[in-house]
From Swiss-Prot:
The gene is N. Its EC number is 3.1.13.-. It comes from the Viruses. GO terms for cellular component: helical viral capsid; host cell cytoplasm; ribonucleoprotein complex; viral nucleocapsid. This is Nucleoprotein.
Length: 560
């Protein structure tokens, strides 16, 4: 029986490529145009917030609204998208046997995907016997992998939302978005990202790239460090840097490779594509495996094709499509709906100006006078003491804080710190007010005691600024202790800082440790450390003492 055979997954992929090659188009230029527009126009503070909520173990309606709003903005910026075009296939489009075959496969696919989404996240079973599955589980335990456990009934509800249908079509990765995020959040040039992903795409023409391949390619393409080594769970992939998202992006950059990812569906060719897919299915003995697990190549193709009758089924934006494949493609009815318009927009950029004026100095002095030297004052920095890029001074009793930034001199060292620690992107410091950080340090109350987590860097910073009068109290929390309230602080106070939009990549020597993926923000770290000492989040509302128009310089409308 065909269903008892091991699925030759890559052979199926190659067969589908050969059969459907006539329906592919060069996509590199369009993907890069969309990627550039997303990189220039999207608010990456919102991207960081969505990436943060996707890391939560449980997400609700508010989280889903944020994801959907961001997906809507991405869809607006993209020219490569799928549009709602519910398709009805009838005799004449396909033969009667083909229509029955298609209807049967869509029904099986509906059952498979429905079963997977109603149960806990699972691994792809393939066609393993029970004894093989048990042996695999033992191997994974030996290697240190933890099995995901559900509640009493074995159900893990990653999304606890009032209307589950709103989850539909919100999670597929898109090459243009992947490239834009790797460029902006990784602090890379788009050319470097494209070259790295092209290497992955070329490898994908002969095999499925795996983590070993990724590690070797990373030696040549440093920007691939951003790709996560973790296995993606169900319904979190949209903005995650998974290997599968990177491979898909690479495939879209390989013009002339007959990649399935570059198929374009139109109302005129839809039935022909489905007919060709059914032909190769019969020839190769492909089938819908109804057991829960990841989709095999045929299942993946069928689902994507039948979701929308027009657009780019693999690589386009489809977040605005309503319904599922079995809702949007049907058999023996007689209707063809209309398609919607598409209209990307363009944006401009800006420049920055001068140093502190007398009026600005007066504003900073007035702000610093509001700090009570007799009460606890926290301070934290990001970047080395010889080249700091962020400084925060926070007084828990009043909630008053001063938060400022500085453009680094050592851009190479900064990039390393961004990738492994603070996640600040150089472009977000272009307009930081020069001289402000040092001026704030000079105005700290004479002889005051500053509370810190790790005193060495702050002491060196004070020495450089001639502030030997200031005393330090180091709370000396362990790394794990200091991060106890990390998720809650980012959830409640993350809106206070919009500068940490990069992706954090754990250092190689820390890979085995449970290292955080949240960026280190000087201000939020101060709040976090005080929360550990208090055992709860602050009761006071944080108040920024400096206006944002002083922390960052005014931007010119255009360049002469």
């Amino acid at each position: 029986m065909a269903h008892s055979k091991e699925i030759p997954s890559f052979r199926w992929t190659q067969s589908l490529r050969r059969e459907l090659g006539m329906f592919t188009e060069p996509t590199k230029s369009s993907v890069l145009n969309d990627a550039k527009l997303i990189a220039d126009s999207l608010d990456f503070t919102q991207v960081s917030q969505v990436q943060r909520l996707l890391r939560k173990s449980k997400r609700g309606d508010t989280d889903l609204d944020k994801l959907r709003d961001l997906n809507k903005e991405v869809d607006r910026l993209m020219s490569m998208k799928s549009v709602q075009n519910n398709t009805v296939l009838k005799v004449g489009d396909l033969g009667k046997d083909e229509l029955m075959d298609l209807a049967s496969d869509l029904e099986k696919l509906k059952k498979k995907i429905g079963d997977r989404e109603s149960n806990s996240p699972r691994m792809y079973m393939g066609n393993l016997t029970q004894s093989q599955l048990e042996k695999r589980a033992g191997i994974l335990r030996t290697l240190g992998f933890q099995q995901q456990r559900g509640a009493a009934g074995g159900v893990v509800r990653l999304w606890d939302v009032s209307d589950p249908s709103k989850l539909n079509n919100q999670f597929g990765s898109m090459p243009a978005l992947t490239i834009a995020c790797m460029t902006v959040q990784g602090g890379e040039t788009m050319n470097n990202v494209v070259q790295a992903l092209t290497s992955l795409g070329l490898l994908y023409t002969v095999k499925y790239p795996n983590l070993d391949d990724l590690e070797k390619l990373t030696l040549e393409h440093d920007c691939l460090q951003i790709i996560t080594k973790d296995e993606s769970a169900l319904n979190i992939s949209g903005y995650n840097f998974s290997l599968s998202a990177a491979v898909k992006a690479g495939a879209s950059l390989i013009d002339g490779g007959n990649m399935l990812e570059t198929i374009k569906v139109t109302p005129n060719n839809f039935s022909s594509i489905v007919k060709a897919a059914l032909n190769v299915k019969r020839r190769e003995g492909m089938f819908i495996d109804e057991r829960p697990g990841n989709r095999n190549p045929y299942e993946n193709l069928l689902y994507k094709l039948c979701l929308s009758g027009e657009g780019w089924p693999y690589i386009g934006s489809r977040s605005q499509i309503l319904g599922r494949s079995w809702d949007n493609t049907s058999v023996d009815l007689n209707a063809r709906p209309v398609t919607g318009p598409r209209a990307p927009e363009k944006n401009g950029q800006n420049i920055r100006l001068s140093n502190l004026s007398e009026m600005q100095e007066a504003i900073v002095k007035e702000a610093m006078r509001k700090l009570d030297s007799s009460d606890t004052i926290w301070m934290d920095i990001e970047g080395p003491p010889t080249d700091p890029v962020e400084l925060a001074v926070f007084q828990p009793s009043s909630g008053n804080y001063v938060h400022c930034f500085r453009k680094p001199h050592d851009e190479k060292g900064f990039k390393n710190g961004s990738r492994h620690s603070h996640g600040i992107l150089l472009k977000d410091l272009e307009d930081a007010q020069p001289g402000l950080l040092s001026y704030v340090i000079g105005l700290l109350p004479q002889g005051s005691v500053i509370t810190v987590q790790g005193a060495d860097d702050i002491k060196k910073l004070f020495d450089i600024h001639g502030r030997k009068d200031l005393k330090l109290v180091d709370v000396r929390l362990t790394g794990e202790q200091s991060r106890i309230f990390e998720q809650e602080v980012w959830e409640k106070f993350g809106h206070l800082c919009r500068a940490h939009n990069g992706v954090i990549v754990p250092k190689k020597k820390n890979k085995e440790a449970n290292s955080t993926k949240e960026p280190h923000c000087a201000l939020l770290d101060c709040i976090m450390f005080q929360s550990v000492l208090d055992g709860h989040l602050p009761d006071t509302i944080p108040i920024q003492l400096l206006p944002n128009t002083l922390v960052f310089q005014a931007k010119s409308a255009f360049v002469m």
